[in-house]
Amino acid sequence: MIKEILKKADEKMGKSIVALKRELASMKAGRANPAMLDRIDAEYYGSMTPLNQLANISVPEARVLLIQPWDKSSMGAIEKAILKSDLGLNPSNDGTVIRLVIPELTEETRKNIVKTVKKTGEETKVAIRSIRRDCNDDVKNLKKDDVSEDDIKKTEDDIQKKTDKYIKEIDSIISAKEKEILSI
C-alpha cells in the first residue's frame, strides 16, 4: 500500500511537470514554435478541431511558422482562429500555405510574459503541494490498517523529498524559460 501511494505521488507530480512544460512551450518567446498553436481550435465542418489536426505546421525560419492545411477549404477557418487567438499574430495566406511571422518582442512584452511564466510556475507548485497533501492524507489513513508509526513517518518523509525534487525542477524550468524570453 505504501509503495502504491509513493508511485501515485510520483505519477501525479510528473504529470504536473509535463503539463507545465506544455503550457510554457505555447508561450511565445520571440521564436517560432509549433506548440504556440496547440491551444488554437478552428471550426471545421461544424466542429472545433485543433489546428495540428487540420494542417502540417513547420518552422522554415527562426521566426516564421508555416501552416500547410491538408484541406485547402479550411484555410479561412484556420486564419480566423489565429486572428481570434490571444497570440496577436497576423496570418498571411498565399492560397496554398499560411505564414505566421513572429514579431520581435518589446521589453514590456517580455516582462509581461515573464510574469505569466512565474504565475504558471507558482500554480504548478501549488498543484504539487496539493498532491503531497492528498498522499499524506492517504498515508495517515494507513494507521487504521495497522501500519507502524515509523513506516508512516518514513513514507511522509519520502513524499516530502519527492515534493522538494519536483519543486526544484519547476524552479529550473521557470528559470530557463525566463532566460529564453529575456535574451535578445
Swiss-Prot record:
Keywords: Cytoplasm, Protein biosynthesis. The keyword Transcription does not apply. InterPro entries: Ribosome_recyc_fac (IPR002661), Ribosome_recyc_fac_dom (IPR023584), RRF_sf (IPR036191). It is found in: Cytoplasm. Pfam families: RRF. One of its GO terms (biological process) is translational termination. One of its GO terms (cellular component) is cytoplasm. Its main location: cytoplasm. The keyword Protein biosynthesis applies. Signal peptide: none annotated. Responsible for the release of ribosomes from messenger RNA at the termination of protein biosynthesis. May increase the efficiency of translation by recycling ribosomes from one round of translation to another. NCBIfam families: frr (TIGR00496). HAMAP family: RRF (MF_00040). Belongs to the RRF family. This is Ribosome-recycling factor.
